[in-house]
Amino acid sequence: MLGRSGYRALPLGDFDRFQQSSFGFLGSQKGCLSPERGGVGTGADVPQSWPSCLCHGLISFLGFLLLLVTFPISGWFALKIVPTYERMIVFRLGRIRTPQGPGMVLLLPFIDSFQRVDLRTRAFNVPPCKLASKDGAVLSVGADVQFRIWDPVLSVMTVKDLNTATRMTAQNAMTKALLKRPLREIQMEKLKISDQLLLEINDVTRAWGLEVDRVELAVEAVLQPPQDSPAGPNLDSTLQQLALHFLGGSMNSMAGGAPSPGPADTVEMVSEVEPPAPQVGARSSPKQPLAEGLLTALQPFLSEALVSQVGACYQFNVVLPSGTQSAYFLDLTTGRGRVGHGVPDGIPDVVVEMAEADLRALLCRELRPLGAYMSGRLKVKGDLAMAMKLEAVLRALK
């Protein structure tokens, strides 16, 4: 791992000498009667004077003698098995010894204490936090970090709580990096930012005996758009057609079905998407809610594969700008799935309550279900894991 990532162990005083400083059950200490060459590093084991070295050897001998006398019984407590993916850090009379393992390790009673160190790759997440970008946008950003310990001695001697220290380091590095960038750069260059965070975090954690293998930046939601950005959202081509289809249909309905004097290309876009459903009730209602148009336009994207993947029935209680609440359903339990106005025929698996603007942001991929739930913009009644499967529905819109 160290050779692949380009990191190497740095000389850190007595820490490097710990690897060769213990032999036999007495654990001979280099520098017992004279100081080590090169001085003593910060936090390292200081050289022993000859009285201290003599007492250390005598007590260790008595501990080993006690182990031999009571071996049939003490063997159950003194022998420890260390698996391949672990190392055991042993402290004898408070002084650190060579990392032990894998295999069977013998500990002396009363004078040895130990701590196991897991060398396998582990992961943690940086909880989503609100950050302000360079252009004034407010966004909720988190990160997933994978790391492993390459020096068990350093991981025990330098930091008390390694997980918390690494998480705080990753969060601070992420905050500093995102404050210097505008929102568009954060969204378009997440991989580049993640690689930069990887290097910055490793610059700090490699002195702790820890190496970060991967950092994945996750933008949960954009809570506030940039101050100097245009009002219109950036949509992909499919969602632009979906929005133009509904908005164009609403304008024609308000005009009583008469041709709109607007641009011809907008009229053509509406006519291309809308022919399969000329009898939709939206034409008879001059003030059709935006949520109804967006939800019913999901029907062409539903499929049997999506039904088998999700397999749930959702009820959406959408709060309209007027303050009233309207109910819609998305049934992905049978056939190709259904979507429409009103409550479902059976009992829904999940009831989702949100504002109409948040629903629009959700369908336009400006807001993710998890980010909306954590920020309080989406309220869920029922199985939360089932509600998070709405992400599969949003992916079907691509």
UniProtKB/Swiss-Prot annotation:
Residues 287-398 form the SCP2 domain. Ubiquitously expressed at low levels. Expression is highest in brain. The chain crosses the membrane at residues 58-78. The modification Phosphoserine is found at residue 28. The keyword Transmembrane helix applies. The keyword DNA damage does not apply. Keywords: Cell membrane, Cytoplasmic vesicle, Endosome, Lipid transport, Membrane, Phosphoprotein, Signal-anchor, Transmembrane, Transmembrane helix, Transport. A motif (Tyrosine-type lysosomal sorting signal) lies at residues 6-10. It is a single-pass type III membrane protein. Belongs to the band 7/mec-2 family. Interacts with STOM; may redistribute STOM from the plasma membrane to late endosomes. Interacts with FBXW7 isoform 3 and CDK2. This is Stomatin-like protein 1.
